Swiss-Prot record:
Plastid is among the record's keywords: yes
Organism: Arabidopsis thaliana (Mouse-ear cress)
Keywords, alphabetical: Chloroplast, mRNA processing, mRNA splicing, Plastid, Repeat, Ribonucleoprotein, RNA-binding, Transit peptide
Gene null: resulting phenotype: Plants are albinos.
SUPFAM superfamilies: YhbY-like
Listed Pfam families: CRS1_YhbY
Described purpose of this protein according to its UniProt entry: Essential protein required for the splicing of group IIB introns in chloroplasts. Forms splicing particles with CRS2. Interacts with RNA and confers intron specificity of the splicing particles.
Comp. bias (Acidic residues): 526-541
A GO cellular-component term linked to this record: chloroplast stroma
The protein's name: CRS2-associated factor 2, chloroplastic
Record's subunit section: Interacts with CRS2 and RNA. Part of large ribonucleo-protein complexes that include group IIB introns, CRS2 and CAF2.
GO BP, sorted A to Z: Group II intron splicing; mRNA processing
Annotated region described as Disordered, given as residue ranges: 14-73, 420-448, 526-549
Length: 564
């Protein structure tokens, strides 16, 4: 124990806590760490400015050299005036400015690509709102080195969709692929190299009805809105044609003002044929010999390009007017009643005709567009300016105010329509050229006021013998009643008369039939009827049963027995 006690710094009572060393007063008091960490707040603006000033003095920051951070975005006011021709090129990939606006030309493409093929103005743009670059994917993209070699391609060959050799109906995991057709009996599809070969023979009326009826109450369709027929809709229509022979396209809004242009663009770009059209609904047939595997494939647009800058539609001094006249027309247009009211996402098929008819009686016409986007009714005004034609005066208060222009000519040159004077009509005193001259009023004292629609209805009634022109105006009540009775008889005879013949056989039987050759073929508008009446003799349908087994044959036998 004496030896152990002689050792220094040895605690004989190890179980007891050792005495802690004396804390140095210079080092400060010891504080244990808190159970919850203290949050670190951002430095104040004063401290931040001091630090930044200190850094700029000692170690100045280098400017950011990343070009991606310098590109303009939708909040920047980018504007660059352009001229007609090539504005950007990358090898064979060029961006053009022409009559069709901004178009993109790719090597091997059948036509110049655009964002919208139907809603591009006919006026050349004067500037662009973003740098000229392609909205398509680049042809090649180098793979960055990731430390590993790229994966090998799969050896499994995935079969492509082939309309001529579709997968079997009972195969699991494969959707239905529509076969080509309809084809006459005994004929087979063949590969088509151009549009005429893919379409094949023209469809008959009963074939059109057979193709359209399943789509009448089906919502599987392509919706066409304010942008019109866009580039990516080409691939969308072909994806519809993969499953069905007819693609239903429903148009609403701005494109319906000029449906003829929409139908023309659809047939040109897709290669199909429009077999039926009702209002804003179009039925697009793919063709008898269509094959999804050999369809034309186009690159998709990855984003919507910014619309270019076009000249202003509303000029302060329109062509053919002075500044005072334009101001007077705009003031009088505020009290003018609109001819119609356009609803949002509506179908404006008859708008151009209504504006032309309104110009027959007034030099100013106003169309009300409540609730429409400003870009929508401005596009509608641009279309009316080109199709009617007319001069745009104002877009104030969501209304389109138009003037028919100096060079306007009436469609009714022989019998011009004379507007009636009324207190509510303020358009009669707008243009002195609109007032009828005294010679016209004296020469035609019996001219009545009527709209072009009523005149067309009267002409149709005269042609169908439902109306008659009275040559004598001074008729008594009895004579007028006789004329009315004669008209009723002729109209009923015209409606219920048809060519019928009665042929008597030796047995005394009689057969009645109607000759349908003289029946006028109207435009195909109603598909709820039967379409089997236009089958040709060489391609007639197969008989339903043996001869003499139909119920009609039994009725004929009974009639023959009675006649005997």
């Amino acid at each position: 124990m004496a030896i152990v006690a002689s050792l220094r710094d040895i605690n004989l009572f190890s179980s007891l806590p050792s005495t802690p060393p004396m804390a140095d007063s210079s080092s400060g008091t010891f504080r244990p760490a808190p159970p919850i960490p203290i949050p670190k707040y951002a430095p104040s603006n004063r401290n931040r400015n001091q630090k930044t000033n200190h850094q700029t003095d000692t170690n100045p920051k280098k400017p950011q050299s990343n070009p991606a951070l310098k590109l303009p975005h939708h909040r920047t006011r980018y504007y660059k005036p352009v001229k007609e021709g090539v504005i950007s090129s990358d090898g064979d990939r060029t961006i053009l400015i022409g009559d069709s606006g901004v178009s993109y030309q790719l090597p091997g493409a059948p036509f110049e690509f655009q964002f919208s093929y139907s809603e591009t103005p006919k006026v050349k743009p004067v500037g662009i709102r973003e740098p000229a670059f392609m909205p398509f994917a680049p042809p090649t993209m180098p793979r960055p080195w990731t430390g590993k070699a790229p994966l090998k391609k799969s050896k499994k060959k995935i079969p492509l969709f082939d309309s001529f050799n579709p997968p079997p109906a009972g195969k699991s995991g494969v959707k239905y692929v529509e076969m080509p057709g309809p084809l006459p009996f005994g004929r087979y599809p063949k590969e088509g190299m151009n549009r005429e070969e893919v379409l094949g023979e023209p469809l008959k009326r009963w074939e059109k009805g057979m193709l359209i009826k399943p789509h009448m109450h089906d919502n599987r369709q392509v919706n066409l809105g304010r942008d019109g027929f866009t580039h990516n809709m080409l691939e969308l229509i072909h994806s519809h044609w993969k499953r069905r022979r007819v693609c239903k396209v429903r148009c609403k809004g701005v494109p319906t003002v000029d449906m003829n242009n929409v139908c023309r663009v659809l047939e040109e770009k897709t290669g199909g044929e429009i077999i039926h059209r009702v209002g804003g609904v179009v039925y697009l047939f793919r063709g008898r010999n269509y094959n999804y595997r050999t369809r034309p494939q186009y690159p998709l647009m990855l984003w919507k390009p910014a619309a270019p800058v076009y000249p202003k539609l509303i000029q302060e001094v329109p062509e053919g007017l002075t500044k005072e006249e334009a101001h007077e027309f705009r003031v009088k247009g505020k009290s003018l009643r609109p001819i119609c009211k356009l609803s949002k996402n509506g179908v404006y098929v008859s708008l151009v005709k209504d504006v032309r008819d309104a110009f027959e009686l007034s030099s100013l016409v106003k169309v009300d567009c409540p609730g429409l986007e400003p870009s929508d009714y401005k596009k509608i005004g641009a279309k009316l300016k080109e199709l009617v034609p007319c001069v745009l005066l104002s877009f104030d208060d969501e209304q389109i105010l138009m003037w028919r222009g100096r060079e306007w000519k009436s469609r009714f040159v022989d019998n011009p329509l004379i507007p009636s004077l009324s207190e509510t009509n303020t358009t009669n005193e707008l243009d002195p050229s609109d007032k009828p001259s005294e010679e016209q009023t004296v020469a035609n004292p019996s001219t009545t006021i009527s709209s072009p629609k009523m005149i067309s209805l009267w002409q149709r009634a005269l042609e169908s013998s439902k109306a008659v022109i009275l040559e004598e105006l001074d008729l008594g009540p009895d004579d007028l009643l006789k004329k009315v009775e004669e008209l009723e008889g002729t109209s009923l005879a015209a409606e219920h008369t048809y060519t019928a013949m009665v042929l008597s056989n030796t047995d005394g039987a009689a057969e009645d039939y109607v000759d349908e050759k003289d029946r006028s073929e109207e435009y195909y508008s109603d598909i709820d009827d039967d379409f089997d009446d236009e089958c040709s003799d060489d391609e007639s349908l197969d008989p339903v049963g043996p001869v003499g087994s139909l119920p009609v044959d039994k009725i004929v036998r009974k009639l023959r027995e009675r006649l005997k």
